[in-house]
Amino acid sequence: MHNFALKGDWLVKDLNNNKNWLFELDHQDKDEIIEATKHSISSRKKLYDITKSYFPLNNLISKINMIQKQLDSGFGFVLLRNLPIEQFNDEEVKYMLWGIGQYLGYPEIQDKAGSLLHVVTDTGSSVNKTDNIRGFQTNEELQFHTDGADVFALLCLRNAKNGGLSKLVSSVAVFNEIEKTRPDLSEILQEDFYFDSRAQNPNDDKFQKVPIFVK
């Protein structure tokens, strides 16, 4: 068994020494995003029907390409600052996030309702009450996990009154540490485990059988 030799293997000290994961939008970038967002809204297309052609970007493409490279072969995540969300209401900001996302990948259905974008908000429920409730609909702390898509994005509309912090960890670094200290467990973690599917697809089994780590 060998360690995963990937650039996604990082510790906090690596992030402090190398800020390639941090991207700041300047005034020109923001103006271009504002105009693209207005253009997509004025098209009167439904959110899921918005493609690159309805969200035109030009000067920002080079920065988006750098973001894509960082996601694919860098640390595996980025922080994008200064999105001009104050120019729009919450529904309009969805067009901004969706439009930028069109330049980074293809949307993937996230649940049985066919949702491609979720609003993270507390509905007063709990994941322990019903299979139909997922973590982003509660105020409960979510444990470290990975989602099914290759890339996902979180956009902060406003600071939470309490909590709302996001934490990241390198799954590659976690595996390599287990491989170094407990190689017997690294073998087991590459075997199948049962996970609650949270009723995301009516045609799926209630539980999914997948390994925790996959090469």
Regions found by a protein language model. Give the residues of each.
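A short alpha->loop->secondary-structure connector
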Residues: 95-108
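"Short basic amphipathic alpha-helical interaction patches in structured regions
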Residues: 91-98, 168-170
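Active-site environment of non-heme Fe oxygenases that use a 2-His-1-carboxylate facial triad
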Residues: 1-66, 73, 78, 85-87, ...
